[in-house]
């Protein structure tokens, strides 16, 4: 009986041991199965479409390796990086965006501020240029001590002359006046004296004193500087001989060559500031200005002429001067100039749409000043443009065909040449 109990106990213990072994084995099997299932269900390895050089993204390669253009490794382009090709935008991993240090800015509406300094030069005012002549034949009795470059005031004596024609006409006047000549005859003689060049003050003296004058003084008709004076005492003088040339000094002209691209900004005298190196602390008042009608064919500039007050004669003809232009454009859309990609053939920017995609857009830049560009078309107020990190995004847009979709929005994906190009065989020709 005791041996029977021992036999039953041994069977029970053996059964328990066998059950435990089966349980452990089953648990290990199930655990290992659970671990292998995810491994088997892992996503397949990304498919590489081609390799490219980020510095020249329009060329594709069929193998990895060194770029033939730059000393750098080619970068793979994966199939799942192309994004939604039905739209013009591309997606970039947020981590990469952060690493690139991308900065964006809203498109605003405002006016471009211009502040440009242009070299200029001082010249005589040609409206204040006179030629002094006797207008009758005679000879020089006296030359006053003057020469080229001397300043003269209006009424300053230049020369004393004797002119027989004037003496003869005076005699005729006195004869008609004393013998009952008609008013018309007397008036005609006086008018002949004026046309012959006799100074008006000498004519009035003749009428008041009734005395013939034989010596006359030619005087300066304006304030200015003598620019021609070549007479000597005792010289004969003909009626077409120049006694003197005198240039006025107040006001003077200041001329500057202004780029024709900013001619539309010239509005009124308040936008001009004049300075000269000789008197850096002086300011000068611009009375009026005008743009000359022709454009310099070589420099493509317009000639701007300003009439500047010069009462103290600080401004000397021939001086260097500087014309500072301070003005504003009309209101337009504005973006930072660094946001513009200008290839010479097209101008574009990278915008960010509501979904966070980067979308290239063609634009037309009207004007640029002080790192701001005025936009004529392609953007709307409130759009977001990328202002830094442009290069890599633009390269990505080129690779994914976004630029082609921008240029040819009517084409389908299959007809886009940028996406249908075959990768270059890195080993061809070897």
UniProtKB/Swiss-Prot annotation:
<dbReference type="GO" id="GO:0030288">
    <property type="term" value="C:outer membrane-bounded periplasmic space"/>
</dbReference>
<feature type="signal peptide">
    <location>
        <begin position="1"/>
        <end position="28"/>
    </location>
</feature>
<protein>
    <recommendedName>
        <fullName>Putative membrane fusion protein SilB</fullName>
    </recommendedName>
</protein>
<dbReference type="InterPro" id="IPR045800">
    <property type="entry name" value="HMBD"/>
</dbReference>
<dbReference type="InterPro" id="IPR006143">
    <property type="entry name" value="RND_pump_MFP"/>
</dbReference>
<keyword id="KW-0050">Antiport</keyword>
<comment type="function">
    <text>Component of the sil cation efflux system that confers resistance to silver. May be part of a three-component cation/proton antiporter.</text>
</comment>
<comment type="similarity">
    <text>Belongs to the membrane fusion protein (MFP) (TC 8.A.1) family.</text>
</comment>
<dbReference type="InterPro" id="IPR051909">
    <property type="entry name" value="MFP_Cation_Efflux"/>
</dbReference>
<dbReference type="Pfam" id="PF19335">
    <property type="entry name" value="HMBD"/>
</dbReference>
<dbReference type="GO" id="GO:0016020">
    <property type="term" value="C:membrane"/>
</dbReference>
<dbReference type="Pfam" id="PF16576">
    <property type="entry name" value="HlyD_D23"/>
</dbReference>
<feature type="compositionally biased region" description="Polar residues">
    <location>
        <begin position="414"/>
        <end position="430"/>
    </location>
</feature>
<feature type="region of interest" description="Disordered">
    <location>
        <begin position="407"/>
        <end position="430"/>
    </location>
</feature>
<keyword id="KW-0406">Ion transport</keyword>
<dbReference type="GO" id="GO:0046914">
    <property type="term" value="F:transition metal ion binding"/>
</dbReference>
<dbReference type="GO" id="GO:0015679">
    <property type="term" value="P:plasma membrane copper ion transport"/>
</dbReference>
<dbReference type="InterPro" id="IPR032317">
    <property type="entry name" value="CusB_D23"/>
</dbReference>
<dbReference type="GO" id="GO:0015297">
    <property type="term" value="F:antiporter activity"/>
</dbReference>
<keyword id="KW-0614">Plasmid</keyword>
<dbReference type="GO" id="GO:0060003">
    <property type="term" value="P:copper ion export"/>
</dbReference>
<keyword id="KW-0732">Signal</keyword>
<dbReference type="GO" id="GO:0009636">
    <property type="term" value="P:response to toxic substance"/>
</dbReference>
<keyword id="KW-0813">Transport</keyword>
């Amino acid at each position: 009986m005791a041996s029977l109990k021992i036999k039953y106990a041994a069977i029970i213990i053996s059964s328990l041991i066998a059950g435990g072994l089966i349980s452990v084995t089953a648990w290990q099997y199930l655990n290992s199965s659970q671990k292998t299932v995810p491994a088997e269900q892992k996503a397949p390895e990304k498919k590489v479409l081609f390799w490219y050089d980020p510095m020249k993204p329009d060329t594709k390669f069929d193998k990895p390796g060194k770029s033939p253009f730059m000393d750098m490794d080619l970068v793979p382009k994966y199939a799942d990086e192309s994004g939604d090709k039905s739209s013009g935008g591309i997606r970039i991993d947020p981590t990469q965006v952060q690493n690139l240090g991308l900065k964006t800015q809203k498109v605003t509406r405002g006016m471009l501020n211009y502040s440009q300094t242009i070299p200029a030069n001082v010249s005589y005012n040609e409206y204040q240029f006179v030629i002094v002549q006797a207008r009758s034949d005679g000879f020089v009795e006296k030359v006053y001590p003057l020469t080229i470059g001397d300043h003269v005031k209006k009424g300053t004596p230049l020369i004393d002359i004797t002119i027989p024609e004037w003496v003869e006409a005076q005699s005729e006047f006195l004869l008609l006046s004393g013998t009952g000549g008609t008013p018309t005859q007397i008036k005609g003689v006086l008018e002949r004296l004026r046309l012959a060049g006799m100074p008006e003050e000498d004519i009035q003296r003749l009428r008041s004193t009734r005395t013939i004058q034989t010596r006359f003084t030619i005087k300066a008709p304006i304030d200015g500087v003598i620019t021609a004076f070549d007479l000597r005492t005792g010289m004969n003088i003909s009626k077409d001989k120049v006694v003197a040339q005198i240039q006025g000094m107040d006001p003077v002209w200041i001329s500057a060559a202004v780029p024709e691209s900013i001619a539309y900004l010239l509005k009124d005298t308040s936008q001009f500031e004049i300075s000269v190196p000789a008197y850096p602390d002086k300011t000068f008042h611009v009375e009026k200005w005008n743009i000359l009608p022709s454009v310099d064919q070589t420099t493509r500039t317009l000639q701007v002429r300003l009439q500047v007050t010069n009462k103290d004669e600080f401004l000397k003809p021939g001086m260097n001067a500087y014309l500072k232009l301070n003005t504003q454009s009309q209101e337009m859309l504005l973006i930072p100039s660094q946001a513009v990609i200008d290839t010479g053939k097209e101008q574009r920017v990278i915008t960010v749409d509501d979904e966070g995609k980067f979308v290239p857009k063609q634009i037309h830049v009207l004007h640029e000043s002080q790192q701001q560009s005025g936009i004529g078309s392609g953007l709307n107020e409130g759009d977001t443009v990328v202002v830094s990190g442009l290069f890599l995004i633009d390269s990505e847009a080129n690779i994914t065909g976004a630029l082609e979709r921008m240029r040819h929005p009517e084409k389908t994906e299959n007809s886009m040449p940028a996406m249908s190009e075959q990768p270059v065989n890195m080993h061809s020709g070897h």
